[in-house]
Amino acid sequence: MNFENLYAAALALMSIGAAGALAAGKRPALSQVIGCAGLISGIIVSAISVCAGLPDYVNLFRIPILILGLAGVWFSPQYLKGHGSQRSGIYYFFFNLTVAAMLGVTIMNRPIPFLVMWEIMGLASFALVAFDYKSRQVARAAWIYLLACQAGGMVLLGMFLMASSVEAFFILAVIGFGLKIGFPLLHVWLPEAHPAAPAPVSALMSGAMIQLGFYGIWRWGINAVASYSEMFGFTLIALGIICCLGGIILSFPRTNIKTLLAYSSIENMGIISLGCGLGLLGLGKGNVTMIFCGFAGAGLHMLNHALLKGGLFLLAGSVQKATGSLEMEKMGGLLKRMPVSGSLFLLNSAGLSGLPPFNAFVSEFLIYLAGFAAFTVPGKPLFMVAGVAVPVVLALTGGLAAAAFCKVGGAVFLGEPRSKEAAEAVEVPLSMRLPVLLLFLCGCAVTVLTPAAARLFAPEEWIQELYPAIRALQMVAVTSLAVTGLFVLLVLIKGLLPRGKEIRRSCTWDCGFSKPDARMEYTGSAFIQPLVFFCGRLTGAKRKITHPQGSFPEKSSFEEESADPGMEFFWEKSFKFFFRLAAKLNFLQSGYLHFYILIMTAALVLMLVWGFLLPWAGTLMKGGF
């Protein structure tokens, strides 16, 4: 079977659906049907190719694209009602185009087609981020995202042009693909773009698109640096540690649900980076356990993150649909009003924190094993340091993530409503709940099927050496399944037990207050305040306190705002420098056509000189693309 033809057919179906949705834009219902039909048919054809083909690491990137594309297009019709449904033709055009381009990125095997698909993916998703373009905040977020996409594309072009230098190639790969992943200082677009984009788009971008940065590193970077694998392995581990701790710490003071989830995505990209780094160290040393557990743990965590984080972003959209807001301090008590969505949010949050028996624990367990294997490598002190640092960071990150998600769960779903909108919220339609349930059930299936998949992907000659790791993985999967089954059984038994007497329901004990008010309960910010105070300026939080004065003080206040330290201390200063530089170059805009032609001619001459007089550049330009 020719799988390339199947993928080409899938891209064609998605593109036809996109064009049809745009053409029928004046009839929103028709454009919705055409767009959904084109995307779903393309996903089905792609899924046939994935299932019928041989086991391939690329499928770890294709499966999230297909699953989240399906969940997103399933979720979108009800979500768009009252949220831009009259522009559904434009929405489905760019949504289909984004999914098709993401799939195309995983198909293209040569630099130029790969870069073309990469650019289409960035531009199409930019249009989706800017869907509510009339909002000043959305417009700002969209332009920041577009700048990041274009900067990443330029760096990747330079990466391919510098293919003769291994060091430069990998460094540019880390920067170019790191802009998509959200590596330190390259992450600033994530907390801006995700809150601005529609919820299905945020789910697709966070769950599948940013992980394509790792596909780029795996596809183009790792093969090129086999002889330098130790050095670059430590580089990825260092970046992973900063992402893990920095991402989750920066999430603490955030009050917007999707902003917090965006920082959580940075943390999870750090976990994947740790696995990739340990795998590279294993390549340099020839350690089979490190290679397999590192790369397998990273790949499996990509899939788990896609399922869990995609579900959480969709649930954030459900909350926004029900309350009209994403500010968690305006919510409260939604678990009573949205029991299915609230329960799924809490379950996905526990899973993403890496707690057993959920699926993310299984992938992190593999990375733990890779770290323990690094500690036992003889004669390598730095390997021992990595073997200690990685498990410690993973454990610490899991605890901090649990605290961050406790903040969200408590502020949004527990307690009493803090606004009229939260008090009047109702459960979202079934078509918005089923996609999230599908993602969660897929995550449960991943937990059970991981040991079998591990044996399938492991080379035959490695099976004997990997037997202890695979055996431990089987025990984790069986234990997780048993605990989950026991929990479900207890819930069913509780529901079936006869009740001897009627349960009296009354208000919560008010501790002596005659009229308790929602203002008296802890907010999410108050809950997480000890950790924010402990982490200090790392969280980006700034406080302004007006202390009471005099014997009869009239007023006092406490204000806290948070800014991303990377944006505040690096990018804003960098932008100011370039603005000043651009102002000094205004003289080039003389308004004379012949002067512009002279500049273009000079640039063309310089490109020709660079391309034909430099031997390595000429060779690359003639045969490398």
What label would you give each PLM region?
Residues 1-93, 506-508:
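Transmembrane helix-loop-helix hairpins at membrane boundaries of multipass inner-membrane proteins
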Residues 55-65, 174-177, 381-398, 468-489:
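Hydrophobic alpha-helical transmembrane segments
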Residues 18-22, 71-74, 248, 408, ...:
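Alpha-helical transmembrane segments
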Residues 351-366, 440-458, 537-542:
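Alpha-helical transmembrane segments and their membrane-interface junctions
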Residues 240, 341, 348, 432-447, ...:
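Hydrophobic membrane-spanning alpha-helices of multi-pass integral membrane proteins
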Residues 1-6, 54-61, 110-112, 226-235, ...:
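Interfacial loop-to-helix junctions that mark the boundaries of transmembrane helices
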Residues 71-83, 89, 96-114, 124-428:
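Hydrophobic transmembrane alpha-helices and their helix-loop junctions in integral membrane proteins
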Residues 453-479, 495-625:
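Aromatic-capped, Gly/Pro-kinked transmembrane alpha-helices
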